[in-house]
Amino acid sequence: EREKLGKKPIEEEDDHDDDDVSGGKTSEQTVSTTDPDAGMFVKGEHERQFAYEAHTACDKRGFVLGVEVTAGNVHDSVAWDAVYNKITSGFECVKYVVMDAGYKTPWIAKKILEDGRIPILPYTRYKGDKERYKPWEYEYDPVNDSFICPQGGVLRHTTTNKDGKRTYRTTPSKCKSCSCKFKCGANEKGQKVMTTHIWQEFLDLVEAIRKTEKGKRLYTQRKETIERVFADAKEKHAMRYTHYRGLAAVTRWVSLKYAAMNLKKLANWSWDNSCLYVILAALPHNMTRTPIFA
């Protein structure tokens, strides 16, 4: 795309650069002295603690299919590839992938759709200024690769950066005298700048899927499946806090816990469908029972 716009191609970054250097500036990172593998987990404005995250996937019956344990400061979308590849390699029959808003990225939407599967992702609230024009109020012109603002101004495609973001700009001389300039968020020169991802069409398709009856019905099952897995793991299997140090030890511990949860669910199913359960269920229930404590 950059060559079509007369721009130089983006050169690959040097792999030998220091990891803690970004754009010529050093970055600071909070590290635990007790467990350096743990990461600072931030949730909301008040919750900050060193933790691990178990990125988990399950089927519609609540059986855990795969898990990827990372430090608490690793975003869900970063750990997604490892979980997705692990599950799809073992269960090729997967057709629908239901996830929360943390996985709503262009890459994830593109990957799932190109694999012939259907992603189900939730609605995400618009976080911009409510008094200004919304992104969906700009009409896209595929012929000229430009956007038309509500007042008729044209935003031309000027460049594409290394993050896959397309930048569209208006002509300052044409928008400087616009009476609605404050509503579009133009700068002092009267120029409106708008960015969109090169894979935005995949997110648009995900939005269309979300509004279907199938998409609404499948997403409501999250609270009955994966959220129940998390609840049982924390409340019944002591997974609210880790008892080990180091990523390898925590990964083994989480995997063993999930294996036990799967076996427990399978045992309950086998008992409910057994002949002995049917016989005992038919017996009178007014007999005195001896309490058992565990």
Q: What does each model-found stretch correspond to?
A:
Residues 1-294:
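Anion-binding and metal-coordination hotspots
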